[in-house]
């Protein structure tokens, strides 16, 4: 009897040690299912006259779309320093690799940019294959490098018969993503056909927008509406060089598209004010779509990772290292990446975003509720010729606005700032996870500032993941009920595989937990790559047994 008891005690002790010593990882190991992608477009543009001093920075004659198309080559994609080999080594399994403008045969006169016929002069290793086999083999090669798969850029209005052929080719080749950068919004042939024969194909549509939101040159406003605003239907010129549409569509058309596609991209924005411009576009859409499941598309907001994490959106990330300078007036000229923010050095933000979406999947535009603060923040700065290709802004003060606080399916966070306030966003996801982010500001004398505030996040639950992005003076989690005495607070850099017990480093009160901003900075950047300046991104969980 004593022997049996002794054995039992040993077993219990061993089990206890095993549990105690077990490494807790708050981030799933399995790649996410969200349709995010990294896109070649910014890097293509940066390769024009690579490494050469700039004598003429004109985007209309030198650094043009046709010139960028010529950089879409086998060497630039698959070479030793090729994009598919360099980008996102840690999380490319969560991203499609989208080959952008220039991969198709440019000698085909009809619907030149919607043929799915690869240019074999640029990609000679696929020349001996028939067209549908080429994209299949490139998809195989992209996946072999660890990516989720190959995505295709297209633009145009093929006939219904042609569109069926292209969907069939994609099914044959295992292509799961089309970036439709204009077109197919009259009859939605692609949507109708893929729903019938290849529903796995994710379609992205646009209606277009200018690089900045409307009334940008008018001083003294507190609201600068986007083309998606229901208060004013703004019409702006599209990107220079666009041959499909010369103006954007009205808001009614945009809303129709969101009902008829899988992904709606809010479109490009000028780099210095990109976050403010994009936040306004998100607001102008969600205020009309939230709560109506007919709006089934997910919103893709380009390259604002922390905003997308906090609001349950998709990204089309395009940032990349800038290691072949094109110097002009003391700056490395890049019309798509500019300013003191240096997103080229914030590559880990892409990783942390993807890892968060393994925990909390994005939400359609029509899902749940949307709230926003009555107060808007306005950012402004004078654009120079090195900041953007958009010539009407050169030497002029550009102003953009967005709500100070935005929230989906959760109460608005409370924000207290002594001086300049950051933008604050938060969401609660269907699985109970919550995300919150702060975003920086742009002032006339500074193209990027990251102010800190005291933020209170409401409706927090025990044993549910909380994603925290950005910088804070403090972040207080409000649970709304007495906190059990046996809780343990774990936090983990999303790039790490090990959570840390921070219970003794936070302030626990009756119904709240206050986290110092310095602790968020420490934990959330713990795994930053060398020379990476990404904002903090971490996951926290309050565990109660």
Can you say where each PLM-predicted feature lies in the sequence?
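Aromatic-lined carbohydrate-binding/catalytic grooves of carbohydrate-active enzymes
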Residues: 38-188
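Active-site-proximal substrate-binding groove within the catalytic cores of carbohydrate-active enzymes
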Residues: 30, 36-39, 46-63, 155, ...
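C-terminal motif of bacterial Sec signal peptides marking the signal peptidase cleavage site
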Residues: 15-16
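Short, aromatic- and glycine-rich surface loops/edge beta-strands on solvent-exposed regions
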Residues: 537-544
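Short boundary motifs at domain starts and secondary-structure transition points
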Residues: 23-31
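C-terminal (or distal) subdomains of carbohydrate-active enzymes
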Residues: 8-11, 461
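Sec-dependent signal peptide recognition
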Residues: 2-8
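Beta-rich carbohydrate-recognition modules and glycan-binding surfaces
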Residues: 1-2, 178
């Amino acid at each position: 009897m004593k022997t049996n008891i002794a054995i039992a005690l040993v077993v219990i002790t061993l089990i206890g040690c095993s549990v105690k010593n077990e490494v807790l990882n708050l981030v799933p190991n399995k790649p996410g299912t969200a349709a995010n992608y990294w896109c070649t477009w910014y890097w293509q543009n940066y390769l024009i006259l690579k490494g050469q001093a700039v004598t003429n920075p004109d985007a209309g004659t030198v650094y043009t779309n046709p010139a960028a198309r010529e950089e879409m080559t086998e060497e630039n994609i698959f070479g030793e320093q090729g994009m598919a080999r360099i980008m996102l080594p840690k999380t490319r399994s969560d991203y499609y690799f989208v080959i952008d403008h220039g991969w198709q045969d440019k000698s085909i006169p009809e619907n030149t940019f919607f043929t799915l016929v690869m240019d074999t002069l640029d990609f000679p290793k696929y020349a001996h294959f028939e067209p549908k086999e080429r994209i299949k083999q490139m998809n195989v090669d992209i996946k072999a490098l660890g990516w989720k798969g190959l995505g295709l850029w297209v633009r145009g209005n093929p006939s219904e018969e042609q569109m069926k052929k292209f969907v069939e080719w994609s099914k044959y080749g295992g292509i799961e993503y089309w970036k439709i950068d204009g077109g197919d919004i009259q009859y939605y042939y692609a949507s109708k056909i893929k729903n019938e024969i290849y529903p796995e194909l994710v379609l992205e549509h646009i209606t277009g927008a200018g690089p900045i939101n409307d009334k940008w040159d008018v001083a003294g406003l507190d609201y600068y509406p986007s083309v998606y605003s229901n208060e004013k239907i703004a019409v702006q010129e599209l990107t220079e060089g666009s041959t499909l549409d010369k103006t954007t569509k009205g808001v009614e058309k945009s809303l129709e598209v969101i009902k008829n596609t899988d992904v709606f991209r809010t479109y490009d924005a000028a780099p210095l004010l990109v976050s403010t411009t994009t936040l306004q576009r998100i607001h102008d859409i969600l205020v009309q779509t939230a709560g109506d499941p007919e709006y089934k598309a997910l919103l893709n907001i380009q390259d604002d990772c922390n905003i997308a994490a906090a609001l349950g959106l998709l990204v089309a990330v395009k940032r990349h290292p800038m290691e072949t300078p094109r110097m002009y007036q003391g700056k490395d000229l890049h019309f798509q990446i500019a300013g003191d923010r240096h997103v080229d050095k914030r590559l880990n933000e892409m990783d942390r975003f993807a890892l968060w979406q393994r925990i909390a999947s994005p939400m359609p535009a029509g899902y749940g509720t949307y709230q926003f603060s009555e107060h808007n923040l306005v950012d402004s700065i004078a654009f120079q010729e090195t900041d953007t290709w958009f010539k009407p802004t050169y030497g002029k003060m550009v102003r953009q606005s967005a709500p100070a606080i935005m929230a989906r399916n959760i109460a608005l966070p409370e924000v207290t700032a002594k001086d300049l306030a950051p933008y604050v966003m938060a969401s609660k996801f269907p699985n109970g996870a919550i995300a919150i982010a702060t975003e920086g500001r742009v002032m006339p004398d500074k193209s990027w500032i990251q102010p800190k505030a005291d933020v209170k996040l409401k409706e927090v639950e025990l044993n549910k993941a909380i994603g925290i992005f950005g910088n804070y003076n403090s972040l207080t989690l409000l649970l709304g009920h007495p906190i059990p005495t046996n809780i343990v607070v774990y936090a983990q850099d999303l790039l790490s595989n090990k959570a840390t017990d921070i219970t003794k480093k936070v302030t626990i009160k009756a119904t709240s937990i206050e986290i110092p901003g310095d602790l968020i900075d420490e934990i959330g950047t713990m795994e930053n790559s060398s020379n990476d300046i990404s904002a903090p991104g971490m996951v926290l969980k309050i565990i109660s047994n």
